[in-house]
């Protein structure tokens, strides 16, 4: 599937699973850096979201690329367990859950995603809210 379809599937799954609007937007945008920053796409996406999402959501998006290695690193000669360096982090399991529920399974050509238009008001709402001051002081 295309990157757009992957993102729509991810956001649709989160929405249908009752996730917060913030998480739905994070799912929609988690791979936005794939084209512009392929070597650090997670950090790129997280930096865009940072002022408008919680610390937890930011961390999940920032680290999801490393956590996704669990599913395909063995095909590239890498360490599928590299995520384990974060096993004591408070968002470790949340990031595993994100990858499992909304990323690695969102490449299904038969999945019926909601259209991009559905998500526009949610994206606008998240990006229109007052930035988190604790995250914008960096």
Name what the model sees in each region.
Residues 1-8, 12-20, 51-59, 63-138:
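Divalent metal-dependent phosphate-bond-processing catalytic cores, especially two-metal-ion Mg2+/Mn2+ enzymes
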Residues 13-45, 61-65:
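His-Asp-centered metal-binding catalytic motifs of divalent-metal-dependent phosphohydrolases/nucleases
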């Amino acid at each position: 599937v295309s990157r757009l379809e992957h993102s729509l599937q991810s956001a649709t799954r989160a929405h249908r699973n009752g996730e917060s609007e913030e998480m739905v937007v994070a799912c929609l945008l988690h791979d936005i850096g794939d084209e512009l920053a392929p070597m650090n796409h997670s950090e790129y996406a997280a930096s865009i979201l940072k002022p408008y999402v919680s610390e937890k959501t930011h961390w999940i998006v920032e680290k999801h690329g490393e956590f996704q290695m669990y599913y395909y690193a063995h095909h590239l000669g890498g360490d599928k367990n590299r995520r384990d360096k974060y096993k004591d982090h408070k968002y470790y399991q949340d990031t595993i859950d994100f990858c499992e529920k909304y990323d690695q399974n969102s490449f299904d050509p038969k999945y019926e995603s909601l259209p991009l238009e559905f998500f526009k008001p949610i994206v606008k709402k998240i990006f229109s809210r007052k930035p988190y001051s604790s995250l914008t002081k960096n």
